[in-house]
């Protein structure tokens, strides 16, 4: 009987599924510390999405690729605020009772960033095309959820975006120029004709 999955594939899937369980548990731990109704909506929506995505991946792996990944759709977009405006000092809390909305959102953001990396690395080790696509979509979903949380944090001043002087930004951006179209290279057979 032929193997259904490669060793690397199974180990990466194991890591991704364990990470999903940990993320779901982590979000449930955060919930009592969130106070802002908007953050609670984001937390609940994302937790439900992660649970559904986890169940779909488990089913897909057990059915050897049957199923389809679903993209995460954040309900809104906004214009980011750039620059620093008296950022609050940051330090670890001395007890869990001190956790606030900023801590919850920051923890969610870190979870999504780490999961996006893990899922993309797992996709690169995956031989099964359906599971590979599901892991790739999972990485994109994490990036979308991270951006939704980041928007919330940026809007509230929890995650401010430092900027550089405009001349520095323009210098770096304009340093790169479009590439010229590559010249067609003769193939090995064509080179022999020139000799």
Predicted feature residues:
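Tryptophan-rich aromatic "cage" segments
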Residues: 179-195
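Acidic/histidine-rich alpha-helical segments that form the ligand environment
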Residues: 9-31, 85-137, 193-195
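Carboxylate-rich helix-loop segments that flank metal/cofactor sites and access channels
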Residues: 63-107, 162-182
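Conserved alpha-helical segments that form or flank metal/cofactor-binding pockets of metalloenzymes
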Residues: 37-82, 146-156
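Preference for long, well-ordered alpha-helical segments
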Residues: 111-179
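Generic structural signal for well-ordered, non-transmembrane alpha-helical segments
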Residues: 18-21, 44-51, 55, 109-113, ...
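Acidic, metal/ion-handling microdomains and their immediate structural contexts
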Residues: 4-11, 15-62, 124-125
